[in-house]
């Protein structure tokens, strides 16, 4: 039975894990690392790189190297957070026809899900290489504070990558699973503080033993889907650019290559400042003007960096306060605080968390891997490999519809355990109204306009009646993936209409299907490209070997034989320049046949040299050899006695 893998699709890095022998295992990628950069590069020749290879070429291809795209998934172009990112990213963020935030690659608009699909495809391949079998099913994690359209867009990305997404689970919940699965410490409430590359979540979770079963119940969740390590990097980038501008009067923000180098340097400096009190950013030849090349050399202390990001760390505390209030607990009720996400390695973040909760955060959970491990455990639960685990997650935001006067009427309150279902009866606002529009909303504001619109649908053919008389029953149904299905039914006629909220990724079902097919086609294309490269390498090796033999032993061949081999070499070299695998293999075989005579000459010469060496060997040496052999034989005989 094929395994269900667990994938942490992160903003900055991604990770994949699988259950083996009842234990979760994080899988190393082709580069030998346990996490993979969530970076995708689109090259001139059409090749798509994902992970470390994409990151390595980012400096020379900044406009077509996409990172932190998860921050755009399911978002509108006009949102202030998206507008802020436009000025920071070296690639182009553009407005889709439906008003969503898309990206532009090589002059073409692209929705975020296909880009995320490339990262998922890389994780899928990593798992397949390790397991030695095809992987088609996965549990994928998302930030707990992702709204419905962001969850749908993540599911779409999985489909495009050739994965059936068995479950979408929240990152803090996954981390709690990773932490609590083997703990036998009795009932306890834990806080999962998850500050990743692009998003922040806080979840209050109760772990309980009920009839021998590990129950993980999410009491509340809160967060900020536009707060993460990328924002910390951007503060450092701005600081470095400002320092350079003060000294050299040149703004590096206008130079895409320089901006990309600053991004790499800022990330490196941030990591170093978690263990060192000071670091130096040294970027020679960062730019040039009429007076010549310019170099950037800036020293940064940990204290300076902390002052640059103080407000960002503070921003994470408000959601913690709200989450505790919603769960009905005090900081002193929390037994353990778990840190998740690479940014939690920053000492100042740990200090702030300790100050708020009044206790040291746990250090026995790997912040980069815990989420993928939890996803793999959930995969094991779904597959039946992990028993006695019950996961009770919640919906992060309230759900409702727009009613008379532009008010949002909530049907499902935030932090309701899922799956769940709720119904409410509404009526018409006008006499003889024959249709109603159901506007589905998500958020906490009282007025509809202040909340996120997830979609709308109509219920028509309502029989004429005075206002307030018809009874329209609206039902909200949230599945285990926290994805919403809405229906409206006229109780008098039984007429019903329903909608599954689709992702705000601007991708229709047809487009997603086409992308799935493209992915399968690309897999075949990749295989063919690999075979072509192997054929070229084999041919190149053959040419090198024959040329070497020809230079050493060519004088022993007849002129005609030598010319024939040289002509065959030229044929292979010409074939290598093309893309015809069969032609390369045919020419390589022809060269092999043509050089057969040469091979025979080389072999004969080697035999002759070997024979001559044996004859020339002094008699004394032969005697020594004989003695050695006899001695070995005698030793064996002695052992047997």
Swiss-Prot record:
Keywords: ATP-binding, Chaperone, Nucleotide-binding, Phosphoprotein, Stress response. The keyword Lipoprotein does not apply. Residues 604-621 have a biased composition (Low complexity). Pfam families: HSP70. Residues 602-627 are annotated as: Disordered. GO terms for molecular function: ATP binding; ATP-dependent protein folding chaperone; unfolded protein binding. Induction: By stress conditions e.g. heat shock. The modification Phosphothreonine is found at residue 199. Transmembrane segments: none annotated. InterPro entries: ATPase_NBD, Chaperone_DnaK, Heat_shock_70_CS, HSP70_C_sf, HSP70_peptide-bd_sf, Hsp_70_fam. SUPFAM superfamilies: Actin-like ATPase domain, Heat shock protein 70kD (HSP70), C-terminal subdomain, Heat shock protein 70kD (HSP70), peptide-binding domain. Acts as a chaperone. This is Chaperone protein DnaK.
């Amino acid at each position: 039975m094929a395994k269900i893998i667990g994938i942490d699709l992160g903003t900055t890095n991604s990770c994949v894990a699988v259950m083996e022998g009842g234990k979760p295992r994080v899988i190393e990628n082709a580069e030998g690392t346990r996490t993979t950069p969530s970076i995708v590069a689109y090259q001139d020749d059409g090749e798509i790189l994902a992970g470390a290879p994409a990151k390595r070429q980012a400096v020379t291809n900044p406009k077509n190297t996409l990172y932190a795209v998860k921050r755009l998934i399911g978002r509108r172009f006009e949102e202030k957070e998206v507008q802020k990112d436009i000025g920071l990213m070296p690639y182009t963020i553009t407005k889709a026809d439906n008003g969503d935030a898309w990206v532009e690659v090589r002059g073409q608009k692209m929705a975020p899900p296909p880009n995320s699909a490339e990262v998922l495809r890389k994780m899928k391949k990593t798992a397949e290489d390790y397991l030695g079998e095809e992987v088609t099913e996965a549990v994928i994690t998302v930030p707990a504070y992702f709204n419905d359209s962001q969850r749908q867009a993540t599911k779409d990305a999985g489909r495009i990558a050739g994965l059936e997404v068995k479950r979408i689970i929240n990152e803090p919940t996954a981390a709690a699973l990773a932490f609590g699965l083997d703990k036998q410490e009795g009932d306890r409430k834990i806080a999962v503080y998850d500050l990743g590359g692009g998003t922040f979540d806080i979840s209050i979770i109760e772990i309980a033993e009920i009839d021998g079963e590990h129950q993980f119940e999410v009491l509340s969740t809160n967060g900020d889907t536009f707060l993460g390590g990328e924002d910390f990097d951007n503060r450092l980038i701005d600081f470095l650019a400002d320092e350079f501008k003060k000294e050299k009067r040149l703004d590096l923000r206008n130079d895409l290559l320089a901006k990309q180098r600053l991004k790499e340097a800022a990330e490196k400096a941030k990591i170093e400042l978690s263990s060192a009190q000071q670091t130096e950013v040294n970027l020679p030849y960062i730019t040039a003007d009429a007076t010549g090349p310019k170099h950037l050399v800036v020293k940064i202390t940990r204290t300076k960096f902390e002052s640059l990001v103080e407000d960002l760390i503070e921003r994470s505390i408000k959601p913690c306060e709200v989450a505790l209030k919603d769960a009905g607990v005090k900081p002193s009720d929390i037994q353990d605080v778990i840190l998740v996400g690479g940014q939690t390695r920053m000492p100042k973040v740990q200090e702030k968390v300790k100050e708020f909760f009044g206790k040291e955060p746990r250090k026995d959970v790997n912040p980069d891997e815990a989420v993928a491990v939890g996803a793999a455990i959930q995969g094991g639960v779904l597959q039946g490999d992990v028993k006695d685990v019950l996961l009770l997650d919640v919906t992060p935001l309230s759900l409702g519809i727009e009613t008379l006067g532009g008010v949002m009427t909530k049907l499902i309150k935030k932090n309701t355990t899922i799956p769940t279902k709720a119904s409410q009866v509404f009526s018409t606002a006008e006499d003889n109204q024959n249709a109603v529009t159901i506007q589905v909303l998500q958020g906490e504001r009282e007025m509809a306009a202040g909340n996120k619109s997830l979609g709308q649908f109509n219920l028509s053919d309502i029989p004429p009646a005075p206002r307030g008389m018809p009874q329209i029953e609206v039902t909200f149904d949230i599945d285990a993936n926290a994805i919403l299905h809405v229906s409206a039914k006229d109780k008098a006629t039984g007429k019903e209409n329903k909608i599954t909220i689709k992702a705000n990724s601007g991708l229709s079902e047809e487009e997603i299907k086409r992308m799935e097919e493209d992915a399968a086609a690309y897999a075949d294309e990749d295989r063919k490209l690999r075979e072509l490269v192997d054929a070229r390498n084999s041919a190149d090796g053959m040419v090198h070997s024959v040329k070497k033999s020809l230079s050493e032993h060519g004088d022993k061949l007849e002129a005609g034989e030598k010319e024939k081999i040289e002509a065959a070499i030229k044929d292979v070299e010409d074939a290598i320049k093309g893309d015809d695998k069969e032609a390369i293999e045919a020419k390589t075989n022809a060269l092999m046949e043509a050089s057969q005579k040469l091979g025979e000459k080389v072999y004969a010469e080697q035999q002759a040299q070997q024979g001559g060496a044996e004859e020339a060997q002094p008699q004394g040496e032969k005697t020594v050899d004989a003695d050695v052999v006899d001695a070995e034989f005698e030793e064996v005989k002695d052992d047997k006695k």
